[in-house]
Amino acid sequence: MRLHLLEHDPDELSDTHLIQWAKQKGHAVGQTYLCKNEKPPALDEIDWLMVMGGSPSVWEEDKYPWLIPEKELIARALVHNKIILGICFGAQLLAQALGGTVSANCPKEIGWHDVNLTKAGRRSFLFRGIPDRFTTFHWHSNCFTVPQGCTRLAFSEAT
């Protein structure tokens, strides 16, 4: 499988464990920093799009103009039935593209917090080998509604 990561903060590196996992499984991995005006590959060159976290909010196109082509890319990937995984800010972008509502009125979670898998999350290959409840580092103050037709796989106290 050809995985491609969309990155949002030029000074942050994606979880090297994620990249190592993908490579160990025999997947090709690419990365694009849209915030550095890098161009992503054509959709026919990727199978799985991973939209990573970042500090912007989904409504800040004026401050981060690269959000406009990123949102267009996500919409095209959905139309072409690409596998898309959104993490943190990436999940907000994906939820918005699918008709969910992103808002800034949820409690901030900054620091180490528990994540709980839902029943669907426990069955998902994405969480194979992961405990039903685990602790990970959070840094977010925005949240989103799960769009119609989508399935929540995990949640924290604030989400």
List where the protein language model places each region.
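Short loop/helix-cap segments at secondary-structure boundaries that form the rim of catalytic
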Residues: 39-44, 93-95, 145-149
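Pocket-forming structural segment of enzyme catalytic cores
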Residues: 98-159
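Phosphate-binding glycine-rich loops and adjacent basic patches that engage nucleotide phosphates
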Residues: 29-40, 87, 108, 149-157
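Short alpha-helical
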Residues: 12-13, 92, 145, 159
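N-terminal beta1-alpha1 cap of cysteine-dependent amidohydrolase-like domains
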Residues: 1-80
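Cysteine-nucleophile active-site neighborhood
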Residues: 52-124
